[in-house]
Amino acid sequence: MTLGQQAEAHAQRYLEQQGLTFVERNVRYPFGEIDLIMRHKSHWVFVEVKYRSATQYGGALQALSAAQITRIRKAANHYLQLNRLDVPCRFDVIAMEADQIHWLVDAF
């Protein structure tokens, strides 16, 4: 299991402990990828997981670019259309740095 996969598994467990329900992991399309799809009450939550073992080159949050946000939004819209879902959704970020985890709800 790669570091990225370990971070995603840890993020999934963390979100489940916070009351979210796991739906899918690593949903990929040619134009974008979604790390985790969760449900929180009536909302579908598309989660981007960022992990950095050290902050010397910028933290986990700094690793999220505007281009990545655009790709994640496109992938989420495509997922909703493919699954014929007309539901409220949001985009969260799990930023992991060394032994700390930060959950940004409705991050973008």
Curated annotation (Swiss-Prot):
- Matches recorded under Pfam families: UPF0102
Q: What is this protein called?
A: UPF0102 protein Sbal_4100
Q: Which NCBIfam families match?
A: PRK12497.1-3 (NF009150), YraN family protein (TIGR00252)
InterPro entries, per the entry: Restrct_endonuc-II-like, tRNA_endonuc-like_dom_sf, UPF0102_YraN-like
Q: What are this entry's molecular-function GO terms? A: nucleic acid binding
What is stated as this protein's family in its record?
Answer: Belongs to the UPF0102 family.
